[in-house]
Protein backbone atom coordinates (compact mmCIF):
# COMPACT_ATOMS: atom_id res chain seq x y z
CA UNK A 1 0.00 0.00 0.00
CA UNK A 2 1.14 3.52 -0.70
CA UNK A 3 2.08 5.98 2.02
CA UNK A 4 -0.04 9.07 1.38
CA UNK A 5 -0.96 11.61 4.07
CA UNK A 6 -4.62 12.33 3.26
CA UNK A 7 -4.56 15.82 4.80
CA UNK A 8 -1.92 16.87 2.26
CA UNK A 9 -3.93 15.81 -0.78
CA UNK A 10 -5.74 18.16 -3.13
CA UNK A 11 -8.96 16.24 -2.42
CA UNK A 12 -8.70 16.90 1.33
CA UNK A 13 -8.18 20.60 0.76
CA UNK A 14 -11.19 20.64 -1.57
CA UNK A 15 -13.24 18.92 1.14
CA UNK A 16 -12.20 21.55 3.67
CA UNK A 17 -13.49 24.27 1.35
CA UNK A 18 -16.65 22.28 0.65
CA UNK A 19 -17.26 21.84 4.38
CA UNK A 20 -17.45 25.62 4.77
CA UNK A 21 -20.33 25.56 2.29
CA UNK A 22 -22.00 22.55 3.93
CA UNK A 23 -21.58 23.08 7.67
CA UNK A 24 -24.86 24.97 8.08
CA UNK A 25 -26.88 23.10 5.43
CA UNK A 26 -29.73 21.07 6.91
CA UNK A 27 -30.88 17.61 5.96
CA UNK A 28 -34.44 18.90 5.74
CA UNK A 29 -33.43 21.51 3.14
CA UNK A 30 -31.67 18.85 1.08
CA UNK A 31 -34.85 16.76 0.97
CA UNK A 32 -36.96 19.83 0.19
CA UNK A 33 -34.80 20.57 -2.86
CA UNK A 34 -34.80 17.04 -4.26
CA UNK A 35 -37.76 14.66 -4.16
CA UNK A 36 -35.53 11.94 -5.66
CA UNK A 37 -32.96 12.16 -2.88
CA UNK A 38 -33.62 8.66 -1.57
CA UNK A 39 -33.06 7.15 -5.01
CA UNK A 40 -29.74 8.99 -5.36
CA UNK A 41 -28.44 8.12 -1.90
CA UNK A 42 -29.42 4.49 -1.36
CA UNK A 43 -28.36 1.12 -2.70
CA UNK A 44 -29.36 -2.52 -2.39
CA UNK A 45 -27.26 -5.66 -2.04
CA UNK A 46 -28.35 -9.04 -3.39
CA UNK A 47 -32.03 -8.28 -2.72
CA UNK A 48 -31.13 -8.96 0.94
CA UNK A 49 -30.10 -5.54 2.17
CA UNK A 50 -31.13 -1.92 1.58
CA UNK A 51 -28.72 0.79 2.68
CA UNK A 52 -30.28 4.26 2.88
CA UNK A 53 -27.72 7.01 3.41
CA UNK A 54 -29.95 9.87 2.23
CA UNK A 55 -30.43 11.25 5.76
CA UNK A 56 -26.87 12.55 5.85
CA UNK A 57 -25.40 16.02 5.53
CA UNK A 58 -24.12 15.29 2.05
CA UNK A 59 -24.78 16.25 -1.55
CA UNK A 60 -23.71 14.70 -4.80
CA UNK A 61 -20.78 17.12 -4.76
CA UNK A 62 -19.81 15.94 -1.27
CA UNK A 63 -19.67 12.33 -2.41
CA UNK A 64 -17.72 13.23 -5.55
CA UNK A 65 -15.11 15.01 -3.45
CA UNK A 66 -14.92 12.12 -0.99
CA UNK A 67 -14.52 9.70 -3.90
CA UNK A 68 -11.69 11.90 -5.17
CA UNK A 69 -10.01 11.46 -1.77
CA UNK A 70 -10.34 7.68 -2.07
CA UNK A 71 -8.82 7.83 -5.53
CA UNK A 72 -5.96 10.11 -4.52
CA UNK A 73 -5.05 7.84 -1.59
CA UNK A 74 -5.11 4.82 -3.95
CA UNK A 75 -7.88 2.87 -2.28
CA UNK A 76 -8.32 0.74 -5.41
CA UNK A 77 -4.67 -0.32 -5.25
CA UNK A 78 -4.99 -1.21 -1.57
CA UNK A 79 -8.07 -3.38 -2.22
CA UNK A 80 -6.18 -5.26 -4.93
CA UNK A 81 -3.19 -5.65 -2.62
CA UNK A 82 -5.29 -7.21 0.13
CA UNK A 83 -7.17 -9.58 -2.16
CA UNK A 84 -3.97 -10.70 -3.90
CA UNK A 85 -2.25 -11.69 -0.66
CA UNK A 86 0.29 -8.89 -0.39
CA UNK A 87 1.70 -8.35 3.09
CA UNK A 88 -0.24 -5.18 3.82
CA UNK A 89 0.18 -5.63 7.59
CA UNK A 90 3.69 -4.21 7.34
CA UNK A 91 4.43 -3.85 11.06
CA UNK A 92 4.02 -7.61 11.49
CA UNK A 93 5.04 -8.55 7.93
CA UNK A 94 1.81 -10.43 7.30
CA UNK A 95 -0.78 -10.77 4.59
CA UNK A 96 -4.38 -9.99 5.57
CA UNK A 97 -6.59 -12.74 4.21
CA UNK A 98 -9.76 -13.26 6.19
CA UNK A 99 -11.32 -13.06 2.72
CA UNK A 100 -9.59 -16.38 1.89
CA UNK A 101 -11.41 -18.12 4.75
CA UNK A 102 -14.74 -17.51 3.04
CA UNK A 103 -13.51 -17.75 -0.57
CA UNK A 104 -16.38 -19.91 -1.79
CA UNK A 105 -15.22 -19.57 -5.41
CA UNK A 106 -12.05 -21.45 -4.38
CA UNK A 107 -9.97 -19.39 -6.79
CA UNK A 108 -6.29 -19.53 -5.78
CA UNK A 109 -5.04 -16.94 -3.27
CA UNK A 110 -1.26 -16.96 -3.05
CA UNK A 111 0.93 -16.00 -0.08
CA UNK A 112 4.70 -16.41 -0.40
CA UNK A 113 4.22 -18.36 -3.62
CA UNK A 114 1.78 -20.83 -2.09
CA UNK A 115 -1.97 -21.16 -2.69
CA UNK A 116 -3.59 -21.07 0.76
CA UNK A 117 -6.94 -22.49 -0.35
CA UNK A 118 -6.10 -26.21 -0.01
CA UNK A 119 -5.21 -25.68 3.67
CA UNK A 120 -8.31 -23.53 4.24
CA UNK A 121 -10.52 -26.21 2.71
CA UNK A 122 -8.82 -28.96 4.71
CA UNK A 123 -9.55 -27.20 8.01
CA UNK A 124 -13.16 -26.59 6.95
CA UNK A 125 -13.56 -30.28 6.12
CA UNK A 126 -12.09 -31.22 9.50
CA UNK A 127 -14.47 -28.79 11.23
CA UNK A 128 -17.44 -30.31 9.40
CA UNK A 129 -16.50 -33.83 10.43
CA UNK A 130 -16.06 -32.75 14.05
CA UNK A 131 -19.38 -30.87 14.08
CA UNK A 132 -21.25 -33.80 12.57
CA UNK A 133 -19.90 -36.13 15.27
CA UNK A 134 -20.68 -33.81 18.19
CA UNK A 135 -24.10 -32.63 16.96
CA UNK A 136 -25.12 -36.14 15.90
CA UNK A 137 -24.20 -37.60 19.28
CA UNK A 138 -21.45 -39.86 17.94
CA UNK A 139 -18.86 -38.00 20.04
CA UNK A 140 -19.14 -39.33 23.59
CA UNK A 141 -17.82 -38.03 26.87
CA UNK A 142 -15.79 -40.18 29.26
CA UNK A 143 -18.91 -41.89 30.67
CA UNK A 144 -20.38 -42.61 27.25
CA UNK A 145 -22.88 -39.76 27.26
CA UNK A 146 -23.37 -37.38 24.33
CA UNK A 147 -22.32 -33.73 24.59
CA UNK A 148 -25.03 -31.27 25.67
CA UNK A 149 -22.98 -28.13 26.44
CA UNK A 150 -20.06 -26.44 24.69
CA UNK A 151 -17.88 -23.85 26.44
CA UNK A 152 -15.74 -21.61 24.22
CA UNK A 153 -12.76 -20.26 26.17
CA UNK A 154 -11.07 -17.33 24.42
CA UNK A 155 -10.74 -13.57 24.57
CA UNK A 156 -10.92 -10.68 22.12
CA UNK A 157 -11.45 -11.97 18.60
CA UNK A 158 -11.60 -15.53 19.91
CA UNK A 159 -14.67 -14.61 21.95
CA UNK A 160 -16.44 -11.50 20.66
CA UNK A 161 -17.06 -12.76 17.13
CA UNK A 162 -18.26 -16.28 17.92
CA UNK A 163 -20.41 -15.01 20.79
CA UNK A 164 -21.95 -12.26 18.66
CA UNK A 165 -22.77 -14.62 15.78
CA UNK A 166 -24.16 -17.45 17.91
CA UNK A 167 -26.44 -14.93 19.62
CA UNK A 168 -27.49 -13.35 16.30
CA UNK A 169 -28.28 -16.79 14.87
CA UNK A 170 -30.07 -18.26 17.89
CA UNK A 171 -33.16 -19.00 15.74
CA UNK A 172 -30.96 -21.51 13.88
CA UNK A 173 -29.42 -23.19 16.92
CA UNK A 174 -29.65 -26.91 17.58
CA UNK A 175 -29.88 -28.78 20.89
CA UNK A 176 -26.34 -27.87 22.03
CA UNK A 177 -26.10 -25.15 24.67
CA UNK A 178 -23.31 -22.66 23.99
CA UNK A 179 -21.36 -20.81 26.66
CA UNK A 180 -18.55 -18.27 26.33
CA UNK A 181 -15.86 -17.50 28.89
CA UNK A 182 -13.38 -14.68 28.29
CA UNK A 183 -12.65 -12.62 31.39
CA UNK A 184 -9.74 -13.66 33.62
CA UNK A 185 -11.98 -12.68 36.53
CA UNK A 186 -12.66 -16.06 38.13
CA UNK A 187 -16.32 -15.16 38.45
CA UNK A 188 -16.81 -15.65 34.72
CA UNK A 189 -15.63 -19.26 34.58
CA UNK A 190 -17.08 -20.12 38.00
CA UNK A 191 -20.60 -18.92 37.16
CA UNK A 192 -20.47 -20.57 33.73
CA UNK A 193 -19.51 -23.96 35.15
CA UNK A 194 -22.00 -24.02 38.06
CA UNK A 195 -24.95 -25.55 36.16
CA UNK A 196 -22.87 -27.78 33.86
CA UNK A 197 -22.27 -31.52 34.00
CA UNK A 198 -18.62 -32.55 33.40
CA UNK A 199 -19.83 -35.77 31.75
CA UNK A 200 -21.58 -33.88 28.93
CA UNK A 201 -19.50 -30.69 28.57
CA UNK A 202 -17.05 -30.00 25.74
CA UNK A 203 -14.50 -27.18 26.01
CA UNK A 204 -13.01 -25.32 23.04
CA UNK A 205 -9.76 -23.57 23.99
CA UNK A 206 -9.17 -20.77 21.49
CA UNK A 207 -5.62 -19.44 21.55
CA UNK A 208 -3.31 -19.37 18.54
CA UNK A 209 -0.17 -19.63 20.69
CA UNK A 210 -1.82 -21.53 23.55
CA UNK A 211 -0.14 -19.00 25.86
CA UNK A 212 -2.74 -16.18 26.08
CA UNK A 213 -2.85 -15.38 29.80
CA UNK A 214 -6.60 -14.97 30.24
CA UNK A 215 -7.51 -17.92 28.03
CA UNK A 216 -5.02 -20.37 29.50
CA UNK A 217 -5.87 -19.35 33.08
CA UNK A 218 -9.53 -20.14 32.35
CA UNK A 219 -8.62 -23.32 30.44
CA UNK A 220 -6.62 -24.69 33.38
CA UNK A 221 -9.45 -23.85 35.77
CA UNK A 222 -11.88 -25.67 33.45
CA UNK A 223 -9.50 -28.64 33.33
CA UNK A 224 -9.25 -28.71 37.14
CA UNK A 225 -13.05 -28.55 37.42
CA UNK A 226 -13.40 -31.40 34.96
CA UNK A 227 -10.77 -33.58 36.66
CA UNK A 228 -12.34 -33.04 40.07
CA UNK A 229 -15.07 -35.36 38.76
CA UNK A 230 -13.39 -37.35 36.00
CA UNK A 231 -10.15 -37.94 37.99
CA UNK A 232 -8.17 -39.61 35.21
CA UNK A 233 -6.25 -37.18 32.96
CA UNK A 234 -6.73 -39.44 29.94
CA UNK A 235 -10.38 -38.31 29.90
CA UNK A 236 -9.36 -34.71 29.10
CA UNK A 237 -9.05 -35.64 25.42
CA UNK A 238 -12.76 -36.48 25.25
CA UNK A 239 -13.85 -33.12 26.62
CA UNK A 240 -11.37 -30.58 25.24
CA UNK A 241 -10.50 -29.42 21.72
CA UNK A 242 -8.09 -26.66 20.70
CA UNK A 243 -8.21 -23.83 18.19
CA UNK A 244 -4.48 -23.26 18.00
CA UNK A 245 -1.22 -23.75 16.12
CA UNK A 246 0.95 -24.84 19.08
CA UNK A 247 0.69 -28.62 18.84
CA UNK A 248 3.29 -29.21 21.58
CA UNK A 249 1.46 -27.13 24.21
CA UNK A 250 -1.92 -28.53 23.13
CA UNK A 251 -0.66 -32.08 23.60
CA UNK A 252 0.89 -31.27 26.98
CA UNK A 253 -2.47 -29.93 28.13
CA UNK A 254 -3.99 -33.33 27.40
CA UNK A 255 -5.79 -32.54 24.16
CA UNK A 256 -5.52 -34.98 21.26
CA UNK A 257 -3.80 -32.99 18.50
CA UNK A 258 -6.21 -34.62 16.04
CA UNK A 259 -8.74 -32.32 17.68
CA UNK A 260 -6.60 -29.23 17.18
CA UNK A 261 -7.92 -26.88 14.51
CA UNK A 262 -5.32 -24.57 13.04
CA UNK A 263 -5.42 -21.12 11.51
CA UNK A 264 -2.73 -18.88 10.12
CA UNK A 265 -0.72 -15.71 10.76
CA UNK A 266 -2.66 -13.97 8.01
CA UNK A 267 -5.85 -14.29 10.08
CA UNK A 268 -6.17 -11.33 12.45
CA UNK A 269 -7.90 -12.01 15.75
CA UNK A 270 -10.79 -9.63 15.18
CA UNK A 271 -11.35 -11.13 11.72
CA UNK A 272 -11.07 -14.75 12.85
CA UNK A 273 -14.69 -15.89 13.29
CA UNK A 274 -14.50 -17.15 9.68
CA UNK A 275 -11.67 -19.53 10.64
CA UNK A 276 -11.45 -22.44 13.08
CA UNK A 277 -12.18 -19.85 15.77
CA UNK A 278 -15.75 -20.07 14.45
CA UNK A 279 -16.03 -23.73 15.48
CA UNK A 280 -18.43 -22.76 18.28
CA UNK A 281 -20.66 -21.10 15.66
CA UNK A 282 -20.66 -24.23 13.51
CA UNK A 283 -21.46 -26.40 16.53
CA UNK A 284 -24.31 -24.09 17.52
CA UNK A 285 -26.09 -23.73 14.17
CA UNK A 286 -24.72 -26.65 12.18
CA UNK A 287 -21.96 -26.65 9.60
CA UNK A 288 -24.31 -25.97 6.67
CA UNK A 289 -25.43 -22.71 8.28
CA UNK A 290 -21.79 -21.83 9.02
CA UNK A 291 -21.11 -22.28 5.31
CA UNK A 292 -24.01 -19.93 4.55
CA UNK A 293 -22.39 -17.36 6.85
CA UNK A 294 -19.18 -17.70 4.84
CA UNK A 295 -21.14 -17.43 1.58
CA UNK A 296 -22.78 -14.18 2.64
CA UNK A 297 -19.41 -12.69 3.53
CA UNK A 298 -17.94 -13.90 0.24
CA UNK A 299 -20.77 -12.24 -1.67
CA UNK A 300 -19.95 -8.94 0.06
CA UNK A 301 -16.24 -9.51 -0.66
CA UNK A 302 -17.08 -9.76 -4.37
CA UNK A 303 -19.22 -6.63 -4.14
CA UNK A 304 -16.37 -4.75 -2.45
CA UNK A 305 -13.71 -5.95 -4.89
CA UNK A 306 -15.71 -5.56 -8.10
CA UNK A 307 -18.35 -2.83 -7.69
CA UNK A 308 -17.47 0.71 -8.83
CA UNK A 309 -16.71 3.00 -5.90
CA UNK A 310 -19.81 5.13 -6.56
CA UNK A 311 -22.08 2.14 -5.81
CA UNK A 312 -19.78 0.27 -3.42
CA UNK A 313 -21.50 0.01 -0.03
CA UNK A 314 -18.44 -0.38 2.24
CA UNK A 315 -16.71 2.50 0.46
CA UNK A 316 -19.76 4.77 0.65
CA UNK A 317 -20.23 4.18 4.38
CA UNK A 318 -16.51 4.62 5.01
CA UNK A 319 -16.38 7.95 3.18
CA UNK A 320 -19.42 9.29 5.02
CA UNK A 321 -17.77 8.31 8.31
CA UNK A 322 -14.57 10.18 7.40
CA UNK A 323 -16.67 13.22 6.46
CA UNK A 324 -18.16 13.46 9.95
CA UNK A 325 -15.08 12.42 11.90
CA UNK A 326 -12.61 14.74 10.20
CA UNK A 327 -14.67 17.68 9.01
CA UNK A 328 -17.65 17.94 11.37
CA UNK A 329 -15.61 16.88 14.40
CA UNK A 330 -17.85 13.96 15.35
CA UNK A 331 -15.88 11.74 17.71
CA UNK A 332 -18.26 8.79 17.97
CA UNK A 333 -20.54 6.59 15.89
CA UNK A 334 -23.47 4.65 17.32
CA UNK A 335 -24.52 1.24 15.98
CA UNK A 336 -28.16 0.61 16.87
CA UNK A 337 -29.58 -2.80 15.88
CA UNK A 338 -33.37 -3.09 16.12
CA UNK A 339 -33.17 -6.83 16.70
CA UNK A 340 -32.60 -8.38 20.13
CA UNK A 341 -30.62 -11.29 18.68
CA UNK A 342 -28.09 -8.70 17.44
CA UNK A 343 -27.44 -7.32 20.91
CA UNK A 344 -23.67 -8.00 20.73
CA UNK A 345 -23.19 -6.53 17.24
CA UNK A 346 -22.18 -3.05 18.52
CA UNK A 347 -19.66 -4.56 20.95
CA UNK A 348 -18.20 -6.72 18.19
CA UNK A 349 -17.57 -3.75 15.93
CA UNK A 350 -16.44 -1.66 18.85
CA UNK A 351 -13.44 -3.99 18.83
CA UNK A 352 -13.44 -4.31 15.05
CA UNK A 353 -13.18 -0.57 14.50
CA UNK A 354 -11.38 0.76 17.57
CA UNK A 355 -8.66 -1.92 17.64
CA UNK A 356 -8.15 -1.57 13.89
CA UNK A 357 -8.17 2.20 13.46
CA UNK A 358 -7.44 3.53 16.94
CA UNK A 359 -3.94 4.60 15.86
CA UNK A 360 -2.12 7.94 16.05
CA UNK A 361 0.88 6.98 13.90
CA UNK A 362 0.58 6.99 10.11
CA UNK A 363 2.09 4.46 7.72
CA UNK A 364 5.07 6.82 7.46
CA UNK A 365 5.83 6.26 11.15
CA UNK A 366 4.93 9.83 12.11
CA UNK A 367 2.06 11.16 14.26
CA UNK A 368 -0.95 12.11 12.14
CA UNK A 369 -2.44 15.61 12.01
CA UNK A 370 -6.06 14.47 11.52
CA UNK A 371 -8.61 12.20 13.18
CA UNK A 372 -8.36 8.41 12.73
CA UNK A 373 -10.81 5.89 14.21
CA UNK A 374 -13.99 7.03 15.97
CA UNK A 375 -15.36 5.75 19.27
CA UNK A 376 -17.94 3.02 18.52
CA UNK A 377 -20.80 2.22 20.85
CA UNK A 378 -24.45 1.22 20.84
CA UNK A 379 -27.25 -0.92 22.22
CA UNK A 380 -30.30 -2.62 20.73
CA UNK A 381 -33.41 -0.57 20.01
CA UNK A 382 -35.75 0.22 21.63
CA UNK A 383 -33.73 -0.07 24.85
CA UNK A 384 -31.41 2.73 23.77
CA UNK A 385 -34.36 5.07 23.22
CA UNK A 386 -35.00 4.96 26.96
CA UNK A 387 -31.34 5.43 27.83
CA UNK A 388 -29.08 7.60 25.65
CA UNK A 389 -31.15 8.78 22.67
CA UNK A 390 -31.89 11.96 24.63
CA UNK A 391 -28.30 13.09 24.03
CA UNK A 392 -28.38 12.08 20.37
CA UNK A 393 -31.56 14.10 19.80
CA UNK A 394 -30.96 17.17 21.97
CA UNK A 395 -27.37 17.06 23.22
CA UNK A 396 -24.44 19.17 22.08
CA UNK A 397 -22.51 16.24 20.57
CA UNK A 398 -22.91 15.19 16.95
CA UNK A 399 -23.42 11.40 16.93
CA UNK A 400 -23.85 9.84 13.48
CA UNK A 401 -25.85 6.62 13.83
CA UNK A 402 -26.32 3.38 11.94
CA UNK A 403 -29.80 1.93 12.40
CA UNK A 404 -30.08 -1.78 11.51
CA UNK A 405 -33.30 -3.82 11.35
CA UNK A 406 -34.80 -6.91 9.67
CA UNK A 407 -38.09 -6.64 7.79
CA UNK A 408 -39.03 -10.17 8.88
CA UNK A 409 -38.85 -11.20 12.53
CA UNK A 410 -37.98 -14.69 13.73
CA UNK A 411 -40.55 -14.17 16.50
CA UNK A 412 -43.72 -12.65 14.98
CA UNK A 413 -45.57 -12.27 18.26
CA UNK A 414 -48.73 -10.18 18.03
CA UNK A 415 -47.76 -6.69 16.80
CA UNK A 416 -44.33 -6.61 18.47
CA UNK A 417 -42.37 -6.33 15.24
CA UNK A 418 -44.59 -3.62 13.77
CA UNK A 419 -44.11 -1.58 16.93
CA UNK A 420 -40.35 -2.20 16.87
CA UNK A 421 -40.04 -1.15 13.23
CA UNK A 422 -42.30 1.87 13.70
CA UNK A 423 -39.68 3.09 16.18
CA UNK A 424 -36.86 2.22 13.77
CA UNK A 425 -38.44 4.38 11.04
CA UNK A 426 -39.51 7.14 13.43
CA UNK A 427 -36.13 7.66 15.03
CA UNK A 428 -34.24 8.39 11.81
CA UNK A 429 -37.03 10.72 10.69
CA UNK A 430 -36.98 12.55 14.02
CA UNK A 431 -33.20 12.83 14.03
CA UNK A 432 -33.13 14.19 10.49
CA UNK A 433 -36.05 16.61 10.54
CA UNK A 434 -36.64 17.45 14.20
CA UNK A 435 -39.48 19.63 15.46
CA UNK A 436 -39.48 23.44 15.28
CA UNK A 437 -40.68 25.89 17.92
CA UNK A 438 -43.63 26.73 15.68
CA UNK A 439 -44.62 23.06 15.54
CA UNK A 440 -44.34 22.77 19.32
CA UNK A 441 -46.54 25.84 19.82
CA UNK A 442 -49.06 24.52 17.28
CA UNK A 443 -49.29 21.23 19.18
CA UNK A 444 -49.99 23.13 22.40
CA UNK A 445 -52.53 25.33 20.63
CA UNK A 446 -54.37 22.20 19.49
CA UNK A 447 -54.88 21.35 23.17
CA UNK A 448 -56.31 24.81 23.85
CA UNK A 449 -53.23 26.43 25.37
CA UNK A 450 -51.94 29.88 24.40
CA UNK A 451 -48.29 30.67 23.56
CA UNK A 452 -48.08 32.63 26.82
CA UNK A 453 -49.12 29.59 28.83
CA UNK A 454 -46.42 27.38 27.30
CA UNK A 455 -43.59 29.85 26.78
CA UNK A 456 -41.68 28.47 29.77
CA UNK A 457 -41.61 24.91 28.43
CA UNK A 458 -41.79 25.21 24.63
CA UNK A 459 -38.02 25.69 24.04
CA UNK A 460 -37.28 22.40 25.79
CA UNK A 461 -39.53 20.50 23.39
CA UNK A 462 -37.76 21.75 20.27
CA UNK A 463 -35.74 19.20 18.28
CA UNK A 464 -33.16 20.82 16.01
CA UNK A 465 -32.91 17.74 13.81
CA UNK A 466 -30.05 17.62 11.31
CA UNK A 467 -28.66 14.55 13.09
CA UNK A 468 -27.25 12.17 10.46
CA UNK A 469 -28.13 8.50 10.15
CA UNK A 470 -27.69 5.50 7.89
CA UNK A 471 -30.52 2.95 7.76
CA UNK A 472 -29.63 -0.66 6.95
CA UNK A 473 -32.77 -2.71 6.35
CA UNK A 474 -32.30 -6.46 5.95
CA UNK A 475 -34.95 -8.73 4.49
CA UNK A 476 -34.31 -11.16 7.36
CA UNK A 477 -31.38 -12.02 9.59
CA UNK A 478 -30.11 -15.30 8.19
CA UNK A 479 -26.63 -16.81 8.22
CA UNK A 480 -26.12 -15.46 4.69
CA UNK A 481 -27.33 -11.91 5.35
CA UNK A 482 -25.46 -11.73 8.66
CA UNK A 483 -22.26 -12.80 6.92
CA UNK A 484 -22.75 -10.06 4.35
CA UNK A 485 -23.47 -7.46 7.03
CA UNK A 486 -20.35 -8.33 9.02
CA UNK A 487 -18.20 -8.18 5.89
CA UNK A 488 -19.77 -4.82 5.00
CA UNK A 489 -18.49 -3.34 8.26
CA UNK A 490 -15.11 -5.09 7.97
CA UNK A 491 -14.50 -3.53 4.56
CA UNK A 492 -15.74 -0.15 5.75
CA UNK A 493 -13.09 -0.23 8.48
CA UNK A 494 -10.40 -1.31 6.01
CA UNK A 495 -11.37 1.47 3.60
CA UNK A 496 -11.10 4.11 6.31
CA UNK A 497 -7.72 2.78 7.43
CA UNK A 498 -6.37 2.93 3.87
CA UNK A 499 -7.55 6.50 3.31
CA UNK A 500 -6.34 7.63 6.75
CA UNK A 501 -2.90 6.14 6.03
CA UNK A 502 -2.75 3.85 9.07
CA UNK A 503 -2.12 0.14 9.55
CA UNK A 504 -5.49 -1.36 10.46
CA UNK A 505 -4.38 -4.93 11.12
CA UNK A 506 -1.97 -4.64 14.04
CA UNK A 507 -2.86 -3.77 17.63
CA UNK A 508 0.30 -2.67 19.42
CA UNK A 509 -1.82 -0.59 21.77
CA UNK A 510 -2.76 -3.69 23.76
CA UNK A 511 0.85 -4.59 24.59
CA UNK A 512 2.02 -2.07 27.20
CA UNK A 513 -0.71 -2.86 29.70
CA UNK A 514 0.04 -6.59 29.39
CA UNK A 515 3.77 -5.98 29.94
CA UNK A 516 3.13 -3.94 33.06
CA UNK A 517 0.61 -6.49 34.38
CA UNK A 518 3.25 -9.23 34.02
CA UNK A 519 5.65 -7.05 36.00
CA UNK A 520 3.08 -6.31 38.72
CA UNK A 521 1.73 -9.87 39.13
CA UNK A 522 4.68 -11.21 41.21
CA UNK A 523 4.57 -8.06 43.35
CA UNK A 524 1.07 -9.03 44.50
CA UNK A 525 2.22 -12.33 45.99
CA UNK A 526 3.58 -11.26 49.38
CA UNK A 527 2.68 -8.70 52.01
CA UNK A 528 5.69 -6.48 51.38
CA UNK A 529 5.01 -2.84 50.65
CA UNK A 530 5.46 -1.99 46.97
CA UNK A 531 7.50 1.12 46.10
CA UNK A 532 8.63 0.42 42.53
CA UNK A 533 5.93 2.43 40.73
CA UNK A 534 4.57 5.97 40.76
CA UNK A 535 2.89 7.11 43.97
CA UNK A 536 -0.62 6.43 42.66
CA UNK A 537 0.06 2.87 41.50
CA UNK A 538 2.05 2.08 44.65
CA UNK A 539 -0.81 3.32 46.85
CA UNK A 540 -3.43 1.31 44.95
CA UNK A 541 -1.40 -1.91 45.13
CA UNK A 542 -0.64 -1.46 48.82
CA UNK A 543 -4.27 -0.75 49.68
CA UNK A 544 -5.29 -3.87 47.73
CA UNK A 545 -2.79 -5.89 49.77
CA UNK A 546 -4.10 -4.53 53.05
CA UNK A 547 -7.75 -5.21 52.15
CA UNK A 548 -7.57 -8.65 50.53
UniProtKB/Swiss-Prot annotation:
Keyword hit for Cytoplasm: yes
NCBIfam families linked to this entry: PRK00179.1
Subcellular location(s) per record: Cytoplasm
Enzyme Commission code: 5.3.1.9
Catalytic reaction equation(s): alpha-D-glucose 6-phosphate = beta-D-fructose 6-phosphate
GO terms for cellular component: cytosol
A GO biological-process term: glucose 6-phosphate metabolic process
Pathway in which the depicted protein is active: Carbohydrate biosynthesis; gluconeogenesis; Carbohydrate degradation; glycolysis; D-glyceraldehyde 3-phosphate and glycerone phosphate from D-glucose: step 2/4
Upper lineage: Bacteria, Pseudomonadati, Pseudomonadota, Gammaproteobacteria, Enterobacterales
Molecular function via GO: carbohydrate derivative binding; glucose-6-phosphate isomerase activity; monosaccharide binding
Highest taxon of the lineage: Bacteria
This protein's name: Glucose-6-phosphate isomerase
InterPro entries, alphabetized: G6P_Isomerase (IPR001672), G6P_Isomerase_C (IPR023096), Phosphoglucose_isomerase_CS (IPR018189), SIS_dom_sf (IPR046348), SIS_PGI_1 (IPR035476), SIS_PGI_2 (IPR035482)
Record-stated family: Belongs to the GPI family.
Coiled coil (residue ranges): none
SUPFAM superfamilies: SIS domain
Protein encoded by which gene: pgi
UniProt function note: Catalyzes the reversible isomerization of glucose-6-phosphate to fructose-6-phosphate.
This protein's UniProt keywords: Cytoplasm, Gluconeogenesis, Glycolysis, Isomerase
Pfam families associated with the record: PGI
HAMAP family registered for this protein in UniProt: G6P_isomerase
Active site positions: 355 (proton donor), 386, 514
Amino acid sequence: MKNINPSQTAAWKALQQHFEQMKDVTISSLFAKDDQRFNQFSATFDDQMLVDFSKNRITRETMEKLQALAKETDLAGAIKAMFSGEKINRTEDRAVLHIALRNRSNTPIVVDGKDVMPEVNAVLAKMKQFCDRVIGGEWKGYTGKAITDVVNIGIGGSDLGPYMVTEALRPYKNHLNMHFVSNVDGTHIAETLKPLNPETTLFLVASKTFTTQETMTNAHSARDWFLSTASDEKHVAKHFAALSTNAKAVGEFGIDTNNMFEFWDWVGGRYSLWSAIGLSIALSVGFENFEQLLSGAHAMDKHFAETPAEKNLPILLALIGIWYNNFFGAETEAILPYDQYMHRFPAYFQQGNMESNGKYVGRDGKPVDYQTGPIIWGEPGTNGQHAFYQLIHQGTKLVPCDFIAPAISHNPLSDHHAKLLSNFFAQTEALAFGKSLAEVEAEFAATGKTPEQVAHVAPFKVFEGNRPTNSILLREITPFSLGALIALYEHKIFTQGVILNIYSFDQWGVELGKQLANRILPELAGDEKVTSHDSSTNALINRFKSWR
